[in-house]
Amino acid sequence: MLFRSQMVDNPHRYIVGFGMGGDENAFTLEDYAPAFNIAAEAGYPCTVHAGELCGPESIWDAINFLPIRRIGHGVNSILDAKLLDELVKRNIHLEICPGSNLSLSIFADWDSHPLPSFISKGISVSLNSDDPPFFHTSVGLEYINSAKHMNISLEKLKNISLMAMDASFADADTKSRLMNKIIEF
């Protein structure tokens, strides 16, 4: 298999994880399980895009068919209380991109965005920019807008940064060093 020979048999020090993004309607996650399993068995942590354009069922597919620790977006998990509980139970991290969610009309406005609910339910989340040039945003702007429009406190933003670093695919030394910088902030 080309994937195994390119990624697993010839590792590169800058390749630290495996993931898949794109239009969730264009593929089924189950079809990609073999590639994800090869990556996971080789020690690569995995992430996948789910629950942005499709409903909670795409997130269920992600956590049931793939060895993932993170989900790109995952915002439609808010529509399924059992799924929210499962995300907490499995400590699945959601890579939240409020700016793109609003630009794509997944949520009508800041008040309807589920980020505050995810935080209150104890779901691990991070703030992300998705596609900065396309959505005219940055990670910094996502933090500013989350504070301004969703009343996310500085302490909660700091905790989001800690959750992001904890869920990152960085090595333990890098994680520890960066988490200490966040704590000292």
Residue ranges and their predicted role:
Residues 47-53, 123-138:
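Short acidic/histidine-rich active-site segments
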Residues 1-2:
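Short, small-residue-biased leader/transition segments that mark boundaries at the very start
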Residues 98-104, 126-129, 144-149:
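Short beta-alpha connecting loops at secondary-structure transitions
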Residues 6-17:
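Acidic, His- and aromatic-enriched active-site or binding-groove loops in soluble protein domains
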Residues 67, 94-96, 121-126, 139-144:
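Short acidic (Asp/Glu) and glycine-rich catalytic loops that position anionic groups and cofactors
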Residues 151-185:
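Mid-to-C-terminal alpha-helical segments outside catalytic/metal-binding sites
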Residues 110-120, 134-136, 142:
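Flexible glycine/proline-rich, aromatic-decorated loop/lid segments
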Residues 17-29, 35-106:
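Active-site core of metal-dependent hydrolases
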